[in-house]
Curated annotation (Swiss-Prot):
It is a lipid-anchor. The chain crosses the membrane at residues 218-238. It holds the Pfam family YscJ_FliF. Required for the export process of the Yop proteins. Residues 1-18 form the signal peptide. It is found in: Cell outer membrane. This is Yop proteins translocation lipoprotein J. Belongs to the YscJ lipoprotein family. It comes from the Bacteria.
Length: 244
């Protein structure tokens, strides 16, 4: 009797705690740990598991998926994947013209610069666009000089204006033939990046919507009811026996 009761209680508790579903897969250990810590700071039940190729995946309660995505999106996660030189210039690639090689090289450099800028605290999105120089246009006149545009979307509570000279210097030193005064930087603050959701969180237990704070009490109450069932049945049995 006691074994059956304990087993029933354990099964109920495991059922009530719910099952977790994949939130994001194929993310790096570093980024995954940052995302996991962020979700737990917001009060969500989140875990990580190993994934393919040394990556990891994040899991959350099915009822928390929408909120988890919203929290991570406002914090700039998951970060964008950028192309590397190896991606742009594969070993088995076909021979390209000098202009094509230069374009691919500058694209790879722009990707690397974007990756570097995205590592700055508070940067949500970083883009670098490079315009190649034109030696001569169709009318024989001198072509347009090379230029670059940098777009950064950042947290609203961080002042990025002071970083503009360093950002321009980084781009200037990374791309050959690009003049400092031909680099423009556009900063766009994200008004809600650092806002945290303080609304009460609800969870579903046996199709009953309860607040996260009441979840433990409801599980305890239902477990107690299961424990009382065999006791009441036994008491009823003895009462019927005495009547006979």
């Amino acid at each position: 009797m006691k074994v059956k009761t304990s087993l029933s209680t354990l099964i109920l508790i495991l059922f009530l705690t719910g099952c977790k579903v994949d939130l994001y897969t194929g993310i790096s250990q570093k980024e995954g740990n940052e995302m996991l810590a962020l979700l737990r700071q917001e009060g969500l039940s989140a875990d990580k598991e190993p994934d393919k190729d040394g990556k990891i995946k994040l899991l959350v309660e099915e009822s928390d998926v929408a909120q988890a995505i919203d929290i991570l999106k406002r914090k700039g996660y998951p970060h964008e994947s950028f192309s590397t030189l190896q991606d742009v210039f594969p070993k088995d690639g076909l021979i390209s013209s000098p202009i094509e090689e230069l374009a691919r090289l500058n694209y790879a450099k722009a990707q690397e610069i974007s990756r570097t800028l995205s590592e700055i605290d508070g940067v949500l999105v970083a883009r670098v666009h490079v315009v190649l120089p034109e030696e001569q246009n169709n009318k024989g006149k001198k072509g347009v000089a090379a230029s670059a545009s940098v777009f950064i979307k950042h947290a609203a509570d961080i002042q990025f204006d002071t970083y503009i000279p360093q950002i321009k210097q980084l781009v200037n030193n990374s791309i050959e033939g690009l003049a400092y005064d031909r680099i423009s930087v556009i900063l766009v603050p994200s008004v809600d990046v650092r806002q945290s959701s303080h609304l009460p969180r609800n969870t579903s237990i046996l199709s009953i919507q309860v607040s996260e704070e009441s979840k433990g009490r409801l599980i305890g109450l239902l477990s107690l009811l299961i424990l009382l069932l065999p006791v009441t049945n036994l008491a009823q049995y003895f009462w019927l026996q005495r009547k006979k």
